Amino acid sequence: MCGIVGYIGQLDAKEILLKGLEKLEYRGYDSAGIAVANEQGIHVFKEKGRIADLREVVDANIEAKAGIGHTRWATHGEPSYLNAHPHQSALGRFTLVHNGVIENYVQLKQEYLQDVELKSDTDTEVVVQVIEQFVNGGLDTEEAFRKTLTLLKGSYAIALFDNENRETIFVAKNKSPLLVGLGDTFNVVASDAMAMLQVTNEYVELMDKEMVIVTDDQVVIKNLDGDVISRASYIAELDASDIEKGTYPHYMLKETDEQPVVMRKIIQTYQDENGKLSVPGDIAAAVAEADRIYIIGCGTSYHAGLVGKQYIEMWANVPVEVHVASEFSYNMPLLSKKPLFIFLSQSGETADSRAVLVQVKALGHKALTITNVPGSTLSREADYTLLLHAGPEIAVASTKAYTAQIAVLAVLASVAADKNGIDIGFDLVKELGIAANAMEALCDQKDEMEMIAREYLTVSRNAFFIGRGLDYFVCVEGALKLKEISYIQAEGFAGGELKHGTIALIEQGTPVFALATQEHVNLSIRGNVKEVAARGANTCIISLKGLDDADDRFVLPEVNPALAPLVSVVPLQLIAYYAALHRGCDVDKPRNLAKSVTVE
């Protein structure tokens, strides 16, 4: 949510900022702005809406070698020009952008800003006004910045300009992602490496409660006591081409097509020299020796965790609970004596999950993060990390990260089973390869998925997905995909729960999608389909080859039933994509949603 870019060097700052903000659009935003500095002063441009709207108001002729930019997701104050960042202090000396939530901004306003008239409804403006008050009281900019930071409660990533020192950007971070990018004659800061790939792939990670003084030839990291901190940089594996759509009309379609490649990369990455699936020994031992595992996730990651629970329990014989991160923080269950916590997060920055991680680490429990982003907050703060190796996922609606999470959880469960002396009964490497081939075949059947979307969803107001066992867990993910990008009210249900209330919602023409990939519940789910069809539902059965019936709408390639979620979700992703497309929705950037939810 939100995004920051800052640049200071020899190039055209405004264009670097605008291009950087475009690379952060996937994070979600409702307004955007930049501030650039030159000999004449600091010039602010901002606008409600898209980056394209911001470009329209930026002075194309202005020349500047330094600047800060921001995409805003409204948390305090409605989306508007006045609430958009950057914000300036009352006397105009300071200009600031901020991601996060300042929890005590009301108290700060009451204590320090009684005589200052605020122009916006944001917590951010309070921060820049307090900094100016401290400077007016005799502190220099660095001292005022540091003093203000010590007062802030909540999360923040901040970039600050001083109109009397326009060759420096002051930066700070706490519980909100921020990186510094290094160059020969410039330096850059951003919420995400993808915003900086246009100029550099060398980065320095910032830790919580650190501030940075950035010039075109120097980066000085300090803690909030003013002590200088030395930290090595690293070279990111990302390439600028990794975040381009290429010939695809949308990132979501590209990322759906990349799933077979990701599967094969996971197979390759998690094999040892003998071709046997492997994870670091301490991780395998932690899973095998835990008396209970708690999987923590949000949204799609939570849904992947539901599938992973089945693998760990069925194969490794370790009991598992799956929890929504935002609920766990406030309703922690009774914990076992030797738990292991597994955190699922594509970005590794999910605020709700991090809140749980902080809690369980304080209790002394071990934690494993499964993420797509090395060096992310959840990765750094957990005891162990497994990477998804899925490559950048730009579309807000997750596709390849979901299947990658399931695959990595399957690998983890298999390795833990082996460590516990349990034979899972089949060659997982071989079966994952077969699943990858099946996913590839499904990605080649887009015309059929588009036809189903047209037939069932073009004018529908709602839709239901039903399944049993593993299929039920895929149904809730399929429903989420449809609702978040097409705005159709969609819900996933366990087939057996229909008669306990949901069937009252079925009326003539209601679309009902049913998954049938598990033999032991095949007849039961087909019975549920007959129940809703008898009440007027427009039913669509998607079945696994070998369990199919003549009336099924679509038959999936044959795979090991345990891995069917990897395959059955692909048609649901594509159906959701085409439904959104035909309804005129913004597939990659659906309304009100953010890719990386970095505030609680």
UniProtKB/Swiss-Prot annotation:
Ranges where the SIS domain occurs: 283-422, 452-590
A single GO BP: carbohydrate metabolic process
Pfam families with a match to the protein in the record: GATase_6, SIS
Enzyme Commission identifier(s): 2.6.1.16
Record keywords, A-Z: Aminotransferase, Cytoplasm, Glutamine amidotransferase, Repeat, Transferase
GO molecular-function terms, A-Z: carbohydrate derivative binding; glutamine-fructose-6-phosphate transaminase (isomerizing) activity
Location relative to the cell: Cytoplasm
Top-rank taxon: Bacteria
Main localization, broad class: cytoplasm
A GO CC term attached to the entry: cytosol
Reaction catalyzed: D-fructose 6-phosphate + L-glutamine = D-glucosamine 6-phosphate + L-glutamate
Enzyme superclass (EC): transferase
Active site: C2 (nucleophile), K595 (for fru-6p isomerization activity)
Residue pairs linked by disulfide bridges in the UniProt entry: none
Domain named Glutamine amidotransferase type-2: residues: 2-217
Protein's job: Catalyzes the first step in hexosamine metabolism, converting fructose-6P into glucosamine-6P using glutamine as a nitrogen source.
Assembly and oligomerization: Homodimer.
PANTHER family: GLUCOSAMINE--FRUCTOSE-6-PHOSPHATE AMINOTRANSFERASE, ISOMERIZING, GLUTAMINE--FRUCTOSE-6-PHOSPHATE TRANSAMINASE (ISOMERIZING)
Protein name (database record): Glutamine--fructose-6-phosphate aminotransferase [isomerizing]
Species of provenance: Bacillus spizizenii (strain ATCC 23059 / NRRL B-14472 / W23)
Biological classification of the source: Bacteria, Bacillati, Bacillota, Bacilli, Bacillales
